[in-house]
Amino acid sequence: MSTVLKVDDIQKYYGKKGNITKAIDSISFEVENGEFVGVMGPSGSGKTTLLNCISTIDTVSSGFIHVDGKDITKLKAKALAKFRREELGFIFQDFNLLDTLTAYENIALALTVMKVNHKEIHKRVNEIANSLGIQEILSKYPYEMSGGEKQRVASARAIITNPSMILADEPTGSLDSKSSRMLLESLENLNNNLKATIMMVTHDAFTASYAKRILFIKDGKIFNELIRGNDSRKEFFNRIIEVVTLLGGDNNNVL
């Protein structure tokens, strides 16, 4: 497999001299094409800062981040915008769908901006909608959808451009247990069947158990790493809980 993401000794500081907070402390790791990686850690551990640096929402203080061999820490504003649009897909906790557009139009928007022809857009939207089980809601507006439906539409929007990587920030945070399970099964489907590379930040061990590998962040450093291997999801969940306990608490309020 080829390396999609290479994080090389990155550090991130906030504040000014005399009052500096180190949010990320010399983190390095790689993500291979087709991996589903979860990131967990206590509140304030640096996990969201890490995702923000990878997504170019924030900038690193030092170190390098390569996506498909390109050092994104060196990109200028115009190139950054193109990189975000074409190389990354985003799934947010609050969906970020446009209320005035239907599900179909929300999913297709990025392709429209990229000037993909209408026939190709129609083909790709319907293929992904079928894969995620949302064909019946393509004509609905966000206010007509449940939270789970909105998040699956957001997932379709994230994958529609065939990005190098999908970044998900607490994707189940606003969902009930049934909708959460449906979304996680959708992400699992994107990973297994469409070979999407996914990096997901979550505080929840159940959510994390759908990933194939977990990075645990503590005090801005990688504290531990788990690889699912041949474990069932339940077995992997139990291993995750063991690490959560080592981090100093239970699944409900520490991560």
Where are the regions a protein language model picked out?
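Helix-to-loop junction immediately C-terminal to a conserved catalytic motif
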Residues: 55
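Short coil-to-helix segment of the ABC ATPase nucleotide-binding domain corresponding to the Q-loop/switch region
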Residues: 101-109
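Catalytic Walker B motif of ABC-type/P-loop ATPase nucleotide-binding domains
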Residues: 166-169
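Conserved ABC transporter NBD signature motif
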Residues: 63-71
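Conserved ABC ATPase signature
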Residues: 141-145, 149-151
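The feature captures the beta-strand-to-loop junction immediately N-terminal to the Walker
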Residues: 40-42
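A short, proline-enriched helix->beta-strand linker immediately N-terminal to the Walker B motif
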Residues: 160-164
